[in-house]
């Protein structure tokens, strides 16, 4: 009987330890920033901030590699994902300048020449003609770490979703998934607009793989 009791006790302790390890980390912040008319609020306090644009916190333009000749658009840039150390260093530098909030760049959208150029993006094409775009898990784990590191260091992030421009992969590339035009992004009855809303849904309901918290939490 004793061996069985010991086994059950060890199992219970193991489960409790695992539960603690999987518990979501608490945020550095108490509130999301809200708007009251023209005023931004942190709880019941007015929130004011200044910061610089930080476009490479979650995807880097790899200028050193030059243009990708497999991209006939005459531009064809290469990209790479930043390391956790790079993200930590950049965010620390921003905080040391006094920044309280920072805008990062939009999520990148897959387009037809990416495969030939070895380019990875945040948003992948639907698996079916009428399906919704998919998030690239590899890219989103980099994004997760950016958010977690910013939270840890007390930096708020402004997270836009889809680009106006094609070079990064934006509204034109999102529309191309459904054989629509870039302008259809603004038509609320278009497949492109529906896809845009679904991208937002996927992001804000995502559970951060570093903190264990949902983005909306």
Question: Predicted segment positions?
Answer:
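Boundary at the C-terminal end of the N-terminal hydrophobic targeting segment
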Residues: 19-23
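Active-site mouth of glycoside hydrolases
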Residues: 26-217
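Bacterial N-terminal signal peptides
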Residues: 10-18
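Bacterial N-terminal signal peptides that target proteins for export
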Residues: 1-9
């Amino acid at each position: 009987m004793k061996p069985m009791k010991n086994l059950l006790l060890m199992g219970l302790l193991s489960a409790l330890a695992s539960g603690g390890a999987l518990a979501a980390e608490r945020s550095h912040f108490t509130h999301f920033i809200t708007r009251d008319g023209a005023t931004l609020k942190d709880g019941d306090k007015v929130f004011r901030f200044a910061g610089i644009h930080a476009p490479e916190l979650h995807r880097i333009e790899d200028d050193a590699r030059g243009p990708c000749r497999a991209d006939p658009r005459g531009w064809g840039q290469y990209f790479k994902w930043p390391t956790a150390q790079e993200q930590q260093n950049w965010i620390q530098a921003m905080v040391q300048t006094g920044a309280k909030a920072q805008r990062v760049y939009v999520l990148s959208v897959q387009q037809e020449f990416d495969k030939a150029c070895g380019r990875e993006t945040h948003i992948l094409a639907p698996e079916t003609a009428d399906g919704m775009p998919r998030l690239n898990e590899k890219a989103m784990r980099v994004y997760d770490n950016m958010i977690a590191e910013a939270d840890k260091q007390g930096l708020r992030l402004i997270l836009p979703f889809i680009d106006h421009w094609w070079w990064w992969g934006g509204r034109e590339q999102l529309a191309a998934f459904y054989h629509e035009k870039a302008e259809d992004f603004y038509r609320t009855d278009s497949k492109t607009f529906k896809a845009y809303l679904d991208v937002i849904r996927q992001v804000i309901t995502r559970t951060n793989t570093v903190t264990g918290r949902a983005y909306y939490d």
